[in-house]
């Protein structure tokens, strides 16, 4: 039996990373680790406690105090200190502030530490902004997913509709996504960049199934070489 490998999937906001990562994990019987949900959880906890997000030390202290856990489900369930926050972390307010929290060095180092612990055994699919560059730099399969800002806004809009969330129009979502891209790619700590050895996959005109098949093909090829 070939031991499972680490699969790193990176890319900008709303590129479809989580959806694809979950399906890839399911296909191979791997664990799925939603790193974005971890940063969203810290953001939600800070907002609920009325912590000023510009106070790096207070937010970092909180990140070290709370326990973030996952449980199987569709969608995968997320808990902060035992309380389910699966829907709450997807709110527009959390989405607007998560880049600020994720840019705090001490928060990132704490999350990276937790993510590496989860990934130690292999057989894991992890998606985020800096998995292939910072969290799992030695992952044998690295994918960098991209799509046009308009297509990502359209997908987010449909996703919001499905969840019954009023997250604004496609145009408003596109502006928010472009702002998020700029924040993510220019931050000082672990900016959003493609790892030198990552495969860039433009999903603008691909179906979810086509994206999953392409990534699965790369995993199978890597497993054969082991």
Curated annotation (Swiss-Prot):
It catalyses: CMP + ATP = CDP + ADP; dCMP + ATP = dCDP + ADP. GO terms for molecular function: ATP binding; CMP kinase activity; dCMP kinase activity. InterPro entries: Cytidylate_kin, Cytidylate_kinase_dom, P-loop_NTPase. GO terms for biological process: nucleobase-containing small molecule interconversion; pyrimidine nucleotide metabolic process. Transmembrane segments: none annotated. This is Cytidylate kinase. GO terms for cellular component: cytosol. It comes from the Bacteria. Its EC number is 2.7.4.25. Belongs to the cytidylate kinase family. Type 1 subfamily. It comes from Limosilactobacillus fermentum (strain NBRC 3956 / LMG 18251) (Lactobacillus fermentum). The keyword Transferase applies. SUPFAM superfamilies: P-loop containing nucleoside triphosphate hydrolases. Coiled coil: none annotated. It is found in: Cytoplasm. ATP binds at residues 11-19. It is an enzyme of class 2 (transferase). Keywords: ATP-binding, Cytoplasm, Kinase, Nucleotide-binding, Transferase.
